[in-house]
Amino acid sequence: MCIRDSHYGEISYPGKNNSQLYKEDILVGYRWHDTKNIIPSFGFGHGLSYTTFELFDINTNKNKYRLNEKINVVCKVRNIGNVEGKEVVQVYVGKENSKVERAKKELKGFKKVKVSSNEYVEVNINIPVKELAYYDENSASWKIEKGDYIIYIGNSSRAIAKEIKIKIL
């Protein structure tokens, strides 16, 4: 296609913008729904399967972290259905009483695992503390707020199996 073709009507250039400009700022998609307490029809990460899973024995390696450390989230995924399947474990993090506008929770890690029927697998997801930073427009730099955070573990933004409180020192 060239400009000459569209100029002489040999092709029809639609003239439509193929990009999307969001007005929600940082609260796009599931972040908007969660932060504004709006229940969507399907949460982020929701999906259907021919089998059923449960998440259990969910923990972090500790509850206090320094800036150079990693948060290790461990959980087990059991397939309680009759056929083999795959499940995605999702880890979200939220900052309590943030001094800046932030989403209630943000996806920080995930892992897809295959689990045979009536079996379970252990899942480890590591999140560097530096991934909890926010962008400060005034200083044009990334900053990490110290204090309390909540780790949300589940298989979608609306299906949270456990919440764990941690502290960044």
List each language-model region with its residue ranges:
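Terminal connector regions
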Residues: P128-L169
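Intrinsically disordered, low-complexity Pro/Gly/Ser/Thr-rich segments with frequent PxxP/GP/PP motifs
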Residues: K99-E137
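Solvent-exposed residues in well-ordered beta-strands and their adjoining turns
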Residues: N61, R78-I80, G94, N126-K130, ...
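Intrinsic-disorder/low-complexity, polar/charged segments enriched in Ser/Thr/Lys/Arg/Asp/Glu/Gln
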Residues: K70-N72, Y120-N124, A161-E163
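Short acidic, flexible loop segments centered on an aromatic residue
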Residues: N82-K99, K105-L107
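Secreted, periplasmic, or luminal enzymes acting at the cell surface/secretory milieu
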Residues: R4-K86, Y92, K146, I150-G154, ...
